[in-house]
Amino acid sequence: AMVGNLLVIVNDNEKQQYIAAFDKQTGKQVWRTNRSLGNKGMQSGWVTPFVWRHALRTEIVTVGPNVAVSYDLAGKELWRLAGMCPAPIPMPFAYDGLLYIDGGRGSSMFAVRPGAAGDISLAKEESSNAHVVWSQPRAGTYLPSPVAYEGGVYTLTETGILSRFEAKTGKLTYKTRIDPAATAFTTSPWAYNGKLFCLSEEGQTFVIAAGEKFQLLHVNALDEMAQATPAIVGERLLVRTESRLYSIRRAK
């Protein structure tokens, strides 16, 4: 992740876990902080650090094995939240004043308010506390990262189960299989123009109406394997499949 003049990386593996910042111009290490993530199961993580800018400060949020940890721009730990899976993959993100953390397959989804400090982990039987606005047990996903859009947070499992939660409260508004024939999803969903888009590994893009009720509008087929999340660049959507790179824009 880039923040100011710093390139920040997280290195969580079976031998060591640390976060480090490097000068983006020279490559010189500016600081390094070793991470204590516990000793349960795997020690490897896959989540890119997320720079959370809000009114109180700028934080570097990391999601690692078993725990999420936030740091200030000097590498000092600000807070930590237990409850992640042993090898999380989905990216955290900010939306409408809150931080959203997908703890990975089999774990919870969390919404965190700005200003947290210390250990903000939920006690047993708790679903919220002074810093965690809400949590949803077993709402975490394996590969795709969630997306927030028009008041909803959407999660997609690798097997094609789409769920929508109210962003402010965590209330589940629906949970459904997108299509009986679509059972493999690696890419993260994206949204614009009142619609949600989910691209399957088979190259089918399922277009779903944004809102509290599930409505599949149509399906676009590329007829080739797709495992990379598309990127929105200006008015274009870039989609990479097994052998092609597509640049798609709305017809004028």
Give residue spans per PLM region:
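Noncatalytic, solvent-exposed loop/strand surfaces
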Residues: 1-252
